[in-house]
Each structure stands twice: as structure tokens, then as C-alpha cells.
Amino acid sequence: MKTLGEFIVEKQLDFSHATGELTALLSAIKLGAKIIHRDINKAGLVDILGASGVSNIQGEDQMKLDLFANEKLKAALKARGEVAGIASEEEDDIVIFDGGRAENAKYVVLMDPLDGSSNIDVNVSVGTIFSIYRRITPFGTPITEADFLQPGTKQVAAGYVVYGSSTMLVYTTGYGVHTFTYDPSLGVFCLSGEKVRYPATGCMYSINEGNYIKFPLGVKKYIKYCQEQDEATQRPYTSRYIGSLVADFHRNLLKGGIYIYPSTASHPQGKLRLLYECNPMAFLAEQAGGKATDGVNRILDIVPEKLHQRAPFFVGTKSMVEDAEGFIAKFPDEEAK
């Protein structure tokens, strides 16, 4: 049995120039995940369920667990001293860590502390998503928003934690995707999958079909394609949608499938956040042999203009994403009014 800590250190030794700072940063995320895991498991017993009574910058109600997870991860990252600051879906602006050590830190972290938190009240899987970049401002100076507004191709590492029947941490540093399962009796994450890849073909599609009438024409046509009978392509595909990006992505990664959150009449720019959700998941998908686009453009090539920028999102098995892109190209964008 190999623990996450042992695995990270082992991989660090493969690079003679490694300083251990990224290793320490990942350890901070690991600690935050353990704390969130602990409290999610007793969410029905303590007063951390339901809405907090405040809204985030997008105007969405923040759940109590959103704020709890945000504070715990922020504290864990600040304590290590390897991070200059963070940007979070739950924060209006970037958070600059104070102190001389933070000003000389190499990295910034972007995160969705608790994705799918609206599901927690009914005991559905939720997750934490994180993305790590090297700062671009000079060491010894405060970081700025520019450090966070980098394209996804600049990510140093990305990953997620899924809190389900078991808690799993999945991450990449650009050398494959690795999965670790939490053993609560030992308090450690244990290696459960190394260099995980999407199956060559997929048979599941994940989309909120309740919004069908609002979808672009190409997406509607692709959904019908997924539902049609065709033995040669093993259709119809199975529809599976949990409503938690991390849970849907994780299932499709292991089983083969596509996750779609397109633009709609009410959200013409898409709804998922480019920096906190799309970029880290796109990095993981590509490292696992999959593909991620906004329906036309590669997600990782998009240069962000603002912290809470949104984007349509198509991610999963490469052939399925390419099929969806084909329908979008063939049937020009047409949204229901």
C-alpha cells in the first residue's frame, strides 16, 4: 500500500530541480480534504446544512458547507507558506496572503471548495476542485489578479476530491492522472489508480435534460443522436446526470462518457466557471486521454478576462466530445427564445 504522501515524494525525486514546495502545497490540500470529509460525514448531526443566508458574487445562495469548506481550505493553504494567495468561487476577489513568506511563494491556487453543495442536504456526492499555477508577478511583491488570469495550459497541477461512498482524491501534475482512496481508519489517502485513462469508447452522456428547450440546436441534435438505436456505435447511450460536476466527471472518467453543460437562452456564456471548474477538469481530462472544449474551442487555450468568467463545457471521452462538436458545427447555434 502506497500513501498519497509517499507517492508525491517518489514522483518529486524524478525531477532533480524539484524543491518540494509543490509537494507541501498538495499536502495542504490533502489536509483540507480530510477536514471537509470529516464534517460532511456528520453534516446531518451539526448545524452546517442548508443556506447560509448570503449570496456570492454570481448572486447564488451560498450553502453553509460552501463557506465552511472555503475557510478550511484557505486556512490550510495559508498555513503552509507555499501559496501567495487564492481565488475561490466563494470569494468576490482574490485573497492575498500576508507575510514575507507568502510574498515570496511561487504558487497561487484557484478552487471550488464544495462543488454540488446543493446536493448535500439529500446525501448526494459532492466534491472539491483545485487548480495550481505559478505566479507571474515578481517575487517579493504582492500578487495581483493577473497571476490568476492565465490560460489553463499554464496549470502546474489540478485535481478534485469526491466525497461519496468513499472519499477519493484525483490529481495530475501533467504526467498522468492518479487516484487515491481515503482510509478513515488510518487517516491516509492510499493509491488506488495510477495513470488512469478514459476507456476508448463511452456509453454515457451527462446533461440536465430538464433544460432541453433552452439548448442550442446542435446540442439538441446530439442528444437525439445519443438516444437513437444503432448497434454499430452501441447506441442508445445511457443517460446519467447527478448534478454534481465532480461526481459526474468521475463516473465518466472510469466508465467512459461525456459531460455537457452548454450555453442556454438564460446563460448564453454557459454556467460553469472557467477558472474554478472547467480548466482543472479539462487538464485532468486531457491527461487521461479525453477532451474538453466549449463546443468549438479547446478549454485550456481560452485566455480568461475575469475571475468568475463562465464557459460552456463539453468534457469526457475524446470520440464523444468530437461527435458533439460535429453536431454543433453542422447545426449553427440556435437557442430557444
UniProtKB/Swiss-Prot annotation:
UniProt keywords, alphabetically: Carbohydrate metabolism, Cytoplasm, Hydrolase, Magnesium, Metal-binding
This protein's superkingdom? Bacteria
Q: Which SUPFAM superfamilies match?
A: Carbohydrate phosphatase
For this record, the Gene Ontology CC terms, alphabetical, are: cytosol
- Which InterPro entries does its entry note? FBPase_C_dom, FBPase_class-1, FBPase_N, FBPtase, Fructose_bisphosphatase_AS
Subunit structure, as described in the record: Homotetramer.
Q: Which organism is it from?
A: Yersinia enterocolitica serotype O:8 / biotype 1B (strain NCTC 13174 / 8081)
The entry's Mg(2+) 2-binding residues are: D112, D115, E277
Task: Answer yes or no on keyword Magnesium.
Answer: yes
Cofactor binding note: Binds 2 magnesium ions per subunit.
Binding of Mg(2+) 1, residues: E89, D112, L114
The broad enzyme category this protein falls into is hydrolase
Q: What is its EC number?
A: 3.1.3.11
Per the record, the gene is fbp
Q: What cofactors does this protein use?
A: Mg(2+)
Chief site of localization:
cytoplasm
Location(s), subcellular: Cytoplasm
Question: Which protein, by its recorded name, is this?
Answer: Fructose-1,6-bisphosphatase class 1
Can you tell me which family this protein belongs to? Belongs to the FBPase class 1 family.
Binding positions (substrate): D115, G116, S117, S118, N208, Y241, K271
Give any Pfam family that matches.
Answer: FBPase
GO molecular-function terms, A-Z: fructose 1,6-bisphosphate 1-phosphatase activity; magnesium ion binding
CDD domains named among the record's database cross-references = FBPase
Q: In which pathway does it act?
A: Carbohydrate biosynthesis; gluconeogenesis
Q: Which GO terms describe its biological process?
A: fructose 1,6-bisphosphate metabolic process; fructose 6-phosphate metabolic process; fructose metabolic process; gluconeogenesis; sucrose biosynthetic process
Q: Which chemical reaction does it catalyze?
A: beta-D-fructose 1,6-bisphosphate + H2O = beta-D-fructose 6-phosphate + phosphate
